[in-house]
């Protein structure tokens, strides 16, 4: 067993980014910076939930990761599966304990999110489209958690909708990228059922829907600062163009990375709008 596997299996960079999105979500909701204690707790609750989710996902995804991600800790033997299971539960427990320090509502929201993460990894992930919706919903509620922690939704509500929509697109594109390994496992993902081309059209629909939804605050009278979202929308549209043009593994990988980047850039665009 490798000690570094306890960090590696959580995907710490992703967890830190998720925590940051939660923190920025609270700032988007308030239109200002909340007190330091809330910021720290939101960051930790979201990061620990993400860490637990990634770990339990690797536990249930062991067989497919032997094909698609052989370098990860479990398939390469750096950590045994039983240890990964208990480690994920420990991370969830610590996150819930910290959520209680925010509020009962924040605790309940975190509990629901953590249960969804477990169910996604255990049962929902192989289900065509339902698994995509589940993980996209978890991404969408990340900035919303920060808003709940400060007791105000504000622009964070629209941000959550956009994050959900673009992540549905990204999850479908990721399935297009992983078709080879999923076929060997016998998974029934959307690209396997519909074909890569039709799945790309579905992903494109959600990508374009994100762009449309991103302009809802403009109709509500949000100031010119909100137009910081325009470059993000262009990135999303370019990712859509790529996956419609070609559905090979390399192109799908590039497209999903662009969609992933757009999620984080959108948070900053909404933050600019909220602060201005």
From Swiss-Prot:
InterPro entries: DGGGP_synth (IPR023547), Prenyltransferase_related (IPR050475), UbiA_prenyltransferase (IPR000537), UbiA_sf (IPR044878). It is found in: Cell membrane. Keywords: Cell membrane, Lipid biosynthesis, Lipid metabolism, Magnesium, Membrane, Phospholipid biosynthesis, Phospholipid metabolism, Transferase, Transmembrane, Transmembrane helix. Its EC number is 2.5.1.42. It comes from the Archaea. It catalyses: sn-3-O-(geranylgeranyl)glycerol 1-phosphate + (2E,6E,10E)-geranylgeranyl diphosphate = 2,3-bis-O-(geranylgeranyl)-sn-glycerol 1-phosphate + diphosphate. It is an enzyme of class 2 (transferase). PANTHER family: CHLOROPHYLL SYNTHASE (PTHR42723), CHLOROPHYLL SYNTHASE, CHLOROPLASTIC (PTHR42723:SF1). This is Digeranylgeranylglyceryl phosphate synthase.
